[in-house]
Design a protein with these regions (language model features):
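Active-site cavity-forming subdomains of large catalytic enzyme subunits
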Residues: 70, 78-79, 128, 133-232, ...
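Beta-strand-rich ligand-recognition modules
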Residues: 467-540
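Glycan-recognition and processing domains
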Residues: 410-458, 466-472
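Catalytic phosphate/nucleotide-handling subdomain of diverse soluble enzymes
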Residues: 93, 97, 105, 319-397
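Active-site-surrounding "flap" and adjacent substrate/cofactor-binding loops of secreted or lumenal enzymes
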Residues: 89-120, 126, 149
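Bacterial Sec-dependent signal peptides at the C-terminal "C-region" and cleavage site
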Residues: 48-60
Length: 544
């Protein structure tokens, strides 16, 4: 990678973006309106006293040993690693469908080291976890969101979907929360944040309020709405796994902090409800959830297609694995994997959560084979290895515990459990935006054809496209985007594989009706060859 790539993109970006108080009642008699006022006044006093008493009730305290804390943290990291490796061969190969029982799911001692050697990109979710953990280790728990955003933008490994869109946004000057907001990131409802939120729960053991605080702040880098709730949910499950023993309890408690009306919350709540209806039949629960919640409306690659990277549906498969796995490590990651879709990310999460709940020492030995061979591995550009992650997490967890009223006496740790945490405010992505059409374009922007016009009817669009000719990695294309005769912006397309723009053209919240989109590539070159594959069109009403 040439040193000037980031600077070049930033400069290109700068060029584009430059264009009354209550009266005290008088009680003369206890009749008529005076009596009503007296009763109301008395009720207010009693309510205030009751609230005061509740506020001053002694907090419940939870205690565990230092060894147990470290064992659970290690179980969380190792569980992620194993779950990811186990489910990697099936990633998105079973889209919106169950992996049938007739299809064996293999695991052997060499699977983990072999995958990491031959296909390290499979573990990209864990790499992001390690990237953020490494940043916190160097800068502390008070690390600002912009520092984590900067670290993500300069990561020296490939990213996808919402994470890659966030990296691109940050590099062109869109800071969090804009980098993760759906108006700037079509993948805001994807499962990217829940794939990278594990570390938050592992450094916040039993501390649900701090977990939410960190997750809200850091999750805005790459997500909003349901995508943000997905990461908060997963982080809370990890945190709660330190203080509870039943997966069902983790899910019940994590749901309490989410807005009840969010699609994400409703989906997971229905998983729990159907688990109680069909406690021995996870496939029945899967069918019900897939039928009702299986349509992806945000991710341009998944709209009107079986591919589903949506946060709520993939979190549902994680939840099914946890509930029907009932604390058994092998059963948990197996069921999660058989739910299909983003199998490796989902099994990494369910494996990490159940690994935290059990602790490293209680993960069956057959799953730990091959672990020693990969412990020293560090992702490219990072100073942290899988082996170091638990000890760094422990250091940050102890700091977090002390900051939140906990005490560390020798090898005994205790901390207060905060109750009645208010649910998060409701935020809805793609509000009044329903996919109406997915249309093949098969257009090119090049030196020969440097411009094109696309007509559509609706309130928004997203175009899947890419650079298809091999060009120098430090080259950056700029494409003007004009809607109905007005410059709506410009898309920057870096050629470097780590910096590519995953969804180069999109715009939402247009007035309903017919529109004309004009695209023109700037500074044409013989090497320019940009494919415009298909357009997803949105409208205020769902497609019939």
């Amino acid at each position: 990678m040439r040193v000037n790539i980031f600077t070049k993109i930033q400069l290109a970006s700068n060029e584009i973006f430059a264009k009354g108080k209550l009266k005290r009642p008088s009680f003369v008699s206890f009749r008529g309106s005076s009596f009503i006022l007296f009763s109301l006044f008395l009720a207010i006093i009693l309510l205030a006293l009751n609230f005061s008493c509740r506020r001053h009730q002694p907090e419940e305290t939870f205690s565990l040993s230092l060894d147990t804390l470290l064992d659970k943290i290690k179980g969380g990291w190792v569980g992620q690693l194993i779950g990811c490796a186990f489910a990697a061969p099936y990633e998105h190969k079973f889209q919106s469908r169950i992996i049938p029982e007739a299809q064996p799911l293999h695991w052997s001692p060499n699977d983990l080291p072999s995958l990491l050697e031959k296909s390290p990109e499979i573990f990209d979710d864990l790499f992001v976890d390690l990237l953020f953990l490494d940043t916190l280790d160097k800068k502390g728990l008070n690390t600002q969101t912009k520092e984590l955003a900067r670290a993500l933008s300069r990561a020296q490994f490939a990213l996808k979907h919402g994470l890659q869109m966030a990296r691109h946004n940050i590099l062109i000057g869109l800071k969090p929360p804009r980098s993760g907001h759906w108006l700037h990131n079509p993948h805001a409802d994807d499962n990217d944040f829940q794939k990278a939120a594990d570390f938050i729960g592992l450094i916040s053991p039993g501390l649900v309020a701090p977990t939410i605080k960190f997750a809200r702040r850091w999750g805005e880098i790459m997500a909003s709405g349901d995508g943000l709730y997905g990461g908060i949910y997963i982080a809370c499950l990890y945190s709660l796994a330190f203080i509870h023993e039943r997966p069902e309890t983790l899910i019940e408690e994590a749901l309490k902090v989410l807005p009840a009306k969010a699609s994400f919350t409703r989906t997971i709540s229905e998983v729990l409800e159907n688990y109680r209806r069909f406690p021995e039949n996870w496939q029945q629960t899967w069918q019900i959830i897939e039928k009702k919640w299986g349509e992806d409306i945000g991710c341009p690659e998944g709209v009107f297609k079986p591919l589903n990277c949506d946060a709520k549906i993939n979190a549902a498969w994680i939840t099914i694995g946890l509930l029907y796995g009932r604390g058994d490590f092998a059963r948990t990651i197996t069921i999660t994997t058989r739910c299909g879709d983003d199998t490796d990310s989902n099994a990494a999460a369910s494996g990490g959560i159940v690994g935290t709940l059990l602790g490293f020492k209680r993960i069956p030995a057959e799953w730990l084979q091959g672990l020693k061979e990969v412990e020293k591995f560090s992702p490219r550009g990072l100073d942290i290895s899988f082996e170091e992650a638990p000890s760094i997490s422990l250091k940050l967890a102890l700091e977090n515990i002390k900051k939140n009223g906990g005490q560390i006496n020798g090898k005994k740790i205790s901390f207060p459990l905060k109750k009645n945490i208010p649910p998060l405010p409701l935020e809805i992505n793609f509000l009044d935006h329903f996919p109406r059409e997915r249309r093949e374009l098969n257009l090119r922007l090049s030196e020969i054809t440097s411009e094109t016009t696309i007509e559509f009817e609706g309130t928004g669009f997203a175009i899947n496209g890419r650079i298809i000719k091999k060009v120098p990695e430090d080259h950056t294309y700029r494409v003007a985007m004009v809607i109905d005769g007005r410059l709506a912006g410009a898309s920057i397309l870096p050629a470097h594989p780590f910096l590519q723009n995953p969804t180069p053209f999109f715009h939402y919240k247009l007035r309903p009706g017919k529109h004309r989109l004009f695209l023109q590539i700037g500074e044409p070159s013989p090497k320019a060859d940009i494919e415009l594959k298909e357009i997803i069109i949105y409208d205020k009403k769902p497609a019939k």
